[in-house]
């Protein structure tokens, strides 16, 4: 048995994401952690596969992403990359792995050797030097602003960011700083719709929203969440795409279509 993908569709690359943004084509991203789902998500037309530290929640059972290790991310990145998907493969740098530019580079190299084509790290202005250091060394970077789960204890919980005038101004400064440093993509999580729209219109790089409204260049959800596999209360920004669908692939195709056609997220999924 092989999960190697044979697709006539061109591969999604970092320049392709930029071209999609400029053409007004929405980008559909989902988290992915193994070969089986990598093949399925790729067939369904997902543009970006994110090996997220959310695996600490949905696979390992932790209440936060903080216990996830670099080895964990590298292992799951290799599982996804072996499929050779058309989708771009992005891997999270876990908590505590990018305290200095040199440390971030060494750990990014490990993830890229495992098959990542881009790394994601959480933070704004304070990370500009690190982002620049990585980009200068041919490591494509996705930044993550707003509700950054690795900062859950600093935030005092999972809270919407950028609601105050000062908070929104800082988010705009962060966005400008990471773009100026060379980031090629940015995730905006749990950010008020109007603020996310302002960031999206200000930047030249694509923005990927999760609980950040419809104006972003694309959307991302945790795979398990969009399939309705979550314990307890469903997060506001999540829609269960499995409802009414005959298969997981049909559910993923429905998600991709909803993102591309701008029918997701709705106001009920935004702040």
From Swiss-Prot:
Catalysis performed (reactions): 3-methyl-2-oxobutanoate + (6R)-5,10-methylene-5,6,7,8-tetrahydrofolate + H2O = 2-dehydropantoate + (6S)-5,6,7,8-tetrahydrofolate
Localization, UniProt: Cytoplasm
Cytoplasm listed as a keyword: yes
Cofactor: Mg(2+)
Pfam family, one: Pantoate_transf
Cofactor: how bound: Binds 1 Mg(2+) ion per subunit.
InterPro entries: Pantoate_hydroxy_MeTrfase (IPR003700), Pyrv/PenolPyrv_kinase-like_dom (IPR015813), Pyrv_kinase-like_dom_sf (IPR040442)
S-adenosyl-L-methionine keyword on record: no
Binding residues annotated for Mg(2+), in chain numbering: 53, 92, 122
This protein's pathway: Cofactor biosynthesis; (R)-pantothenate biosynthesis; (R)-pantoate from 3-methyl-2-oxobutanoate: step 1/2
Domain of life: Bacteria
GO biological process: pantothenate biosynthetic process
Catalytic residue positions: 189
Cited function: Catalyzes the reversible reaction in which hydroxymethyl group from 5,10-methylenetetrahydrofolate is transferred onto alpha-ketoisovalerate to form ketopantoate.
Similarity comment: Belongs to the PanB family.
Subunit structure: Homodecamer; pentamer of dimers.
Protein name: 3-methyl-2-oxobutanoate hydroxymethyltransferase
Organism: Burkholderia vietnamiensis (strain G4 / LMG 22486)
Lineage summary: Bacteria, Pseudomonadati, Pseudomonadota, Betaproteobacteria, Burkholderiales
Gene that encodes it: panB
């Amino acid at each position: 048995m092989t999960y190697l993908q044979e697709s006539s569709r061109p591969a999604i690359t970092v320049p392709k994401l930029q071209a999609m943004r400029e053409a007004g084509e929405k980008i559909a991203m989902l988290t992915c952690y193994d070969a089986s789902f990598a093949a399925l998500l790729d067939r369904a037309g997902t543009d970006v596969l994110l090996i997220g530290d959310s695996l600490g929640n949905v696979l390992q059972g932790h209440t936060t992403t903080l216990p996830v290790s670099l080895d964990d991310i590298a292992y799951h990145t290799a599982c996804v990359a072996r499929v050779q998907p058309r989708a771009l493969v992005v891997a999270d740098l876990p908590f505590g792995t990018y305290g200095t530019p040199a440390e971030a580079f060494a750990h990014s190299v490990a993830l890229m050797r495992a098959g990542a084509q881009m790394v994601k790290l959480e933070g704004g202005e304070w990370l500009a030097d690190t982002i620049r250091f990585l980009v200068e060394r041919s490591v494509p970077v996705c930044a993550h602003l707003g509700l950054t789960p690795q900062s859950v204890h600093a935030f005092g919980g999972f809270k919407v960011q950028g609601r105050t005038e000062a908070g929104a101004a800082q988010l705009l400064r962060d966005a400008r700083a990471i773009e100026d440093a060379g980031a090629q993509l940015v995730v905006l999580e749990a950010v008020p719709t109007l603020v996310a729209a302002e960031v999206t219109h200000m930047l030249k790089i694509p923005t990927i929203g999760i609980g950040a409204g419809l104006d972003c260049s694309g959307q991302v959800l945790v795979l398990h969440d969009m399939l309705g596999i979550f314990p307890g209360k469903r997060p506001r920004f999540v829609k269960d795409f499995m409802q009414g669908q005959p298969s997981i692939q049909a559910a993923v195709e429905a998600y991709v279509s909803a993102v591309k056609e701008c029918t997701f997220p709705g106001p009920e999924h935004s702040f």
